[in-house]
């Protein structure tokens, strides 16, 4: 199992491929090449179904990546409203600060996301 192939499936929303990796023993909390976990890649790319699947399989919703960015912050930075909504509904910590010292609320100008974070 190559990290690059797994990351491609995560980023591009290939749920069947992600399920296959997990069925073959891929750890949903393992840090991949690039210093990020699977949940970060899915959140970063707006892959809602992948996020739901990874969370169902026990992915740590508040795990930081190598830059101390959580999956919630990843989704906020990229403006993925549906991903932000899902992560919050599953208990993501909205008080965590990113490497810039800002919370998710402070880091976005997106009004829909701000409303969710209030």
From Swiss-Prot:
One of its GO terms (cellular component) is cytoplasm. It comes from Gallus gallus. Keywords: ANK repeat, Cytoplasm, Nucleus, Repeat. Its main location: cytoplasm. This is Myotrophin. GO terms for biological process: positive regulation of cardiac muscle hypertrophy; positive regulation of cell growth; positive regulation of macromolecule biosynthetic process; positive regulation of NF-kappaB transcription factor activity; positive regulation of protein metabolic process; regulation of barbed-end actin filament capping. The keyword Isomerase does not apply. It comes from the Eukaryota. Pfam families: Ank_2 (PF12796). The keyword Magnesium does not apply. ANK repeats lie at residues 1-30, 34-65, 67-98. Belongs to the myotrophin family. SUPFAM superfamilies: Ankyrin repeat. It is found in: Cytoplasm; Nucleus; Cytoplasm, Perinuclear region. Regulates NF-kappa-B transcription factor activity. Promotes growth of cardiomyocytes, but not cardiomyocyte proliferation. Promotes cardiac muscle hypertrophy. Plays a role in the regulation of the growth of actin filaments. Inhibits the activity of the F-actin-capping protein complex.
